[in-house]
């Protein structure tokens, strides 16, 4: 070779020429046993003194492999091998730089590069060569520390699984406990108290503050489990077994069942307490009872929302028994005073035609038709009010209310109820029959009435209202059509109040807008709440019509909205010549009834004490007023017909 410098390439070429079959032996020698750190230090120091670039050689996967390669070459004792090896390494370096091209001054992170390439099984090309023996030793220390850490983790995982199988640890959710294992601190962070810190954070120690301990697993919900599938399977089996044992030991109460249904997450923590020690089960029951009492206290503070609960029928029965009147009112309707009123007593479920024979129609309405009828045995005449159920459309309570109110009233000036029949399609009210017709027909016939007759009629009406109002019952539909005229044998007349379809017990202000437009009170239209006073307003309108033949509030254009505005204003006049012959006492009573403010309006008792009513009662034989001419009577009749059209 002459004076050529001794290089690794020349040694490699010489070795290949002399020992063509020894290349594989050199490669295999890399996996031999690693020598001591002292020997490796000498090898690398020698290489640095010889000024050959060790980093440009084929770098082994670990420090032990590098030392093994050098030891194999020294064991052979052939310098030409080193020359040929140097040439081979330089050839690979040229090819490798085409791929990697690392900067001369850059030094990639040692641990990250080694671990990443070791995982991919690649050879580490382009690593800096200026590594001292101290760095190699530290790499070996890191490897040993990692192995020690992995062994400690395996021991901890096995210890945790054994804890679960033994039934140890506080109340934790199974899934949260599994996820917590991956986020514990490594021994590097706390090397001095590695095992001691594990005991402090372990699930064997019973927590002083259960609330804080229960909140810990939530911090590690996003962590991943490092254990293998076998460890997870064994952990799940152990937890399931412990849970089964706990369920068999602990009694399951109805309160516990309801708590499981309402709040799954808190109960899952307590129900999955299968890794509790057996001797601590009593404390667990006490804690669960405390949680149950807190739940019950919260339920008492908050309104019950049964719609959001998901319970079985068995679990829900106690709650339904406690909340029965609120959740299922339809079963206790007859017994509940605050809900729908009970059905009236004495309703006969039979065919009414077997007992009564019907005659002509004497009246009709929105829901009913009134016919004459006669009892088949006694031959007594009655009025049969036939109510069609199909027209009620859920307003059956109105009929029941009417029946109950009529049954509660007993007065000479109120129509009496005799019997009630009911079938699947209709309801039959057998009422007192008044032969004289209603007051509306009487007004059409007579146009107007003398003051004594009008006073007697208002007296009869107010007597009926006194009886009703004393029972806090408001009629709400007073009008001439609902006042029946009974003609007595002495040629006198008596008014009887009928049709209690809109009657109602007044216990608080009513806001329902109802009635007939001509007779409706202003407080009903204002929708500010009303009471018994609306009947007295209607009585004032009826008195006005009885004295002059037309209503006090009229719309020239027959516009209902305009009529309602006039009623709410309360302006009316005693128009001449119709009121020229009417006494001031009669006008005074009308003025005291047609008052917009219901508090200032006359009551039924005050009407009966008015001088005009008292005088009419005492002097029933006062001369009738002078009859008006036929032409004026025809004028009043046509005007009253227009009023009737407005009412209809």
From Swiss-Prot:
One GO cellular component term: nucleus
InterPro entries to which the protein is assigned, alphabetical: Kinase-like_dom_sf (IPR011009), Prot_kinase_dom (IPR000719), Protein_kinase_ATP_BS (IPR017441), Ser/Thr_kinase_AS (IPR008271)
Enzyme class: transferase
Residues bound to ATP: 362-370, 385
Region called Disordered, residue ranges: 86-127, 150-345, 628-648
An individual GO BP term: protein localization to nucleus
Presence of keyword Lipid metabolism: no
Catalytic activity from the UniProt record: L-seryl-[protein] + ATP = O-phospho-L-seryl-[protein] + ADP + H(+); L-threonyl-[protein] + ATP = O-phospho-L-threonyl-[protein] + ADP + H(+)
Phenotype for residue 596 to A: In a colorectal adenocarcinoma sample; somatic mutation
Enzyme Commission number(s) from the entry: 2.7.11.1
Phenotype for residue 108 to L: In a breast infiltrating ductal carcinoma sample; somatic mutation
The UniProt record lists the keyword ATP-binding: yes
UniProt KW keywords: ATP-binding, Cytoplasm, Kinase, Nucleotide-binding, Nucleus, Serine/threonine-protein kinase, Transferase
Active-site residue numbers: 477
Record domain Protein kinase: where: 356-613
Effect of residue 554 to C: In a lung squamous cell carcinoma sample; somatic mutation
CDD domains found in the cross-reference section: STKc_DCKL3
Compositionally biased tracts (Basic and acidic residues): 98-127, 213-234, 255-266, 277-303, 312-338
Effect of residue 570 to R: In a renal clear cell carcinoma sample; somatic mutation
Entry GO MF terms: ATP binding; protein serine kinase activity; protein serine/threonine kinase activity
Taxonomic superkingdom: Eukaryota
Compartments it resides in: Cytoplasm; Nucleus
Family: Belongs to the protein kinase superfamily. CAMK Ser/Thr protein kinase family. CaMK subfamily.
UniProt-recorded name of the protein: Serine/threonine-protein kinase DCLK3
Organism in which the protein naturally occurs: Homo sapiens
Source lineage: Eukaryota, Metazoa, Chordata, Craniata, Vertebrata
Gene (name only): DCLK3
């Amino acid at each position: 070779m002459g004076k050529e410098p001794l290089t690794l390439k020349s040694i490699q070429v010489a070795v290949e020429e002399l020992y063509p079959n020894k290349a594989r032996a050199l490669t295999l020698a890399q996996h031999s046993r690693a020598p001591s750190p002292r020997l490796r230090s000498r090898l690398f120091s020698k290489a640095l003194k010889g000024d050959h670039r060790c980093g440009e050689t084929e770098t082994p996967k670990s420090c032990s492999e590098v030392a093994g390669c050098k030891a194999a070459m020294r064991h052979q004792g052939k310098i030409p091998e080193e020359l040929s090896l140097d040439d081979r390494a330089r050839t690979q370096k040229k090819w490798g730089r085409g791929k990697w091209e690392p900067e001369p001054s850059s030094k990639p992170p040692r641990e990250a590069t080694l671990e990443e390439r070791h995982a991919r099984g690649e050879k580490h090309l382009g690593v800096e060569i200026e590594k001292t023996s101290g760095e190699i030793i530290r790499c070996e220390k890191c490897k040993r520390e990692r192995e020690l850490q992995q062994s400690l983790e395996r021991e901890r995982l096995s210890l945790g699984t054994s804890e679960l199988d033994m039934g140890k640890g506080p109340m934790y959710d199974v899934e949260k406990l599994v996820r917590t294992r991956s986020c514990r601190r490594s021994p590097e962070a706390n090397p001095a108290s590695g095992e001691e810190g594990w005991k402090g954070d372990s699930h064997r120690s019973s927590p002083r503050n259960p609330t804080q301990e229960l909140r810990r697993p939530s911090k590690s919900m996003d962590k991943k489990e490092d254990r293998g599938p076998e460890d997870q399977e064994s952990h799940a089996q152990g937890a399931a077994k412990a849970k089964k044992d706990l369920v068999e030991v602990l009694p399951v109460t109805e309160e516990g069942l309801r708590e499981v249904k309402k709040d799954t997450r808190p109960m899952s923590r307590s129900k999955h307490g299968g890794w509790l020690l057996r001797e601590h089960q009593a404390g667990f029951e006490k804690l669960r009872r405390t949680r149950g009492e807190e739940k019950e206290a919260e339920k008492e503070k908050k309104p019950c929302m049964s719609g959001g609960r998901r319970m079985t029928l068995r679990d829900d029965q106690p709650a339904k028994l406690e909340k029965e009147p609120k959740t299922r009112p339809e079963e206790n309707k007859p017994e509940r005073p605050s809900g729908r009123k009970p059905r009236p007593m004495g309703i006969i479920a039979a065919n009414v035609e077997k007992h009564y024979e019907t005659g002509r129609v004497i009246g009709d309405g929105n829901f009913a038709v009134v016919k004459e009828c006669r009892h088949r045995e006694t031959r007594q005449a009655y009025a049969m009010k036939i109510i069609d159920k199909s027209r009620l459309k859920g307003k059956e309570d109105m009929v029941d209310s009417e029946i109950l109110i009529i049954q509660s009233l007993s007065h000479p000036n109120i129509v009496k109820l005799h019997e009630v029949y009911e079938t699947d399609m209709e309801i039959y009210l057998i009422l007192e029959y008044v032969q004289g017709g209603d007051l509306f027909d009487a007004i059409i016939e007579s146009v107007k009435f003398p003051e004594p007759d009008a006073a007697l009629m208002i007296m009869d009406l107010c007597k009926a209202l006194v009886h009703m109002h004393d029972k806090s019952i408001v009629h709400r539909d007073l009008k001439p059509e609902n006042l029946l005229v009974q003609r007595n044998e002495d040629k006198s007349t008596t008014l009887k109040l009928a049709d209690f379809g809109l009657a109602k017990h007044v216990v608080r202000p009513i806001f329902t807008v109802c009635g007939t437009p001509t007779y409706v009170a202003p407080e009903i239209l204002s929708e500010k709440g009303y009471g018994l006073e609306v009947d007295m307003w209607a009585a004032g309108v009826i008195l006005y019509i009885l004295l002059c033949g037309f209503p006090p509030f009229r719309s020239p254009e027959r516009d209902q909205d305009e009529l309602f505005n006039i009623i709410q204003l309360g302006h009316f006049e005693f128009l001449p010549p119709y009121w020229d012959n009417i006494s001031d006492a009669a006008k005074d009573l009308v003025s005291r009834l047609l008052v917009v403010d219901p508090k200032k309006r006359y009551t039924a008792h005050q009407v009966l004490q008015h001088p005009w009513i008292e005088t009419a009662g005492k002097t029933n034989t006062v001369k009738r007023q002078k009859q008006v001419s036929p032409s004026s009577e025809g004028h009043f009749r046509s005007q009253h017909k227009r009023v009737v059209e407005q009412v209809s």
